[in-house]
From Swiss-Prot:
EC number: 7.1.1.-
Self-association state and partner proteins as the record states: NDH-1 is composed of 14 different subunits. Subunits NuoB, C, D, E, F, and G constitute the peripheral sector of the complex.
Membrane topology annotation: Peripheral membrane protein
Major localization class: membrane
PROSITE patterns for this protein: COMPLEX1_20K
Organism field: Nitrosococcus oceani (strain ATCC 19707 / BCRC 17464 / JCM 30415 / NCIMB 11848 / C-107)
Name of the protein: NADH-quinone oxidoreductase subunit B 1
Record's catalysed reaction(s): a quinone + NADH + 5 H(+)(in) = a quinol + NAD(+) + 4 H(+)(out)
Keyword presence, Translocase: yes
Record keywords, A-Z: 4Fe-4S, Cell inner membrane, Cell membrane, Iron, Iron-sulfur, Membrane, Metal-binding, NAD, Quinone, Translocase, Transport, Ubiquinone
Length: 212
């Protein structure tokens, strides 16, 4: 595919096409299935809810800075209300007193909506195996992506975001109520830990934590 640049002064002049009609159509038209086009728009325009619980939230917010630039992935539009968001990142320790609030906020989010569990505390309770902490946010919320770490680096959060976008792009959701009742077909969720186990077992050079 070739593109031509012209000066602003010559914008009024129409350049004669030097290719065939098929080439002109190929440069100006895009053909796709409606379902694939909608999924492409959803995965590239996630609106996170500005919500955090504890220290992992600091790492999440760091991903919005210029160094990591989450805007590259179309997820920089932070919403201050759950009614305008479609992504909730559970970043931090989930206390039992906070669980009903989190569930209520989740219910107010737009459909379709997704959840990222960020950090060991949100994934499994972390080091707080006590009566006041929920041992995993998936006890009361459906989780789409788990990001391990205590706390995870912004790079890990961005990788989790990319995994979520990949899964959203493969989802098949109903486009109209007039077609009839339809379910949501989700892509399988592979475990990256299992996929990378063989590669990690072959590692012979181990870097210090300040070099990771």
């Amino acid at each position: 595919m070739r593109w031509r640049l012209s000066k602003p002064q010559a914008a009024t002049s129409i350049e004669q096409s030097k290719g065939s009609f098929e080439d002109a159509i190929r440069r100006n038209l895009l053909f796709a299935q409606l379902q694939d086009l909608v999924a492409w728009g959803r995965k590239n325009s996630l609106w996170p809810y500005n919500f955090g619980l504890s220290c992992c939230y600091v790492e999440m917010v760091t991903s919005f800075t210029s160094k990591y630039d989450i805007a590259r992935f179309g997820a920089e539009v932070i919403r201050a209300t759950p009614r305008e968001a479609d992504l909730m990142v559970i970043s931090g320790t989930v206390f039992i007193k906070m669980a009903p609030v989190i569930k209520r906020l989740y219910e107010q989010m737009m459909e379709p909506r997704w959840v990222i569990s960020m950090g060991s505390c949100a994934n499994s309770g972390g080091m707080y195996d006590i009566y006041s902490v929920v041992q995993g946010v998936d006890k009361f919320l459906p989780v789409d992506v788990y990001v391990p770490g205590c706390p995870p680096r912004p790079d890990a959060f961005l990788e989790g975001l990319l995994l979520l976008q990949e899964a959203i792009g493969k989802e098949q959701r109903p486009l109209s109520w007039a077609i009839g009742p339809q379910g949501v077909e989700r892509a399988p969720k592979p475990s990256l830990r299992d996929q990378r186990r063989a590669e990690r077992q072959k590692a012979t050079v181990f870097r210090s934590p300040d070099e990771v």
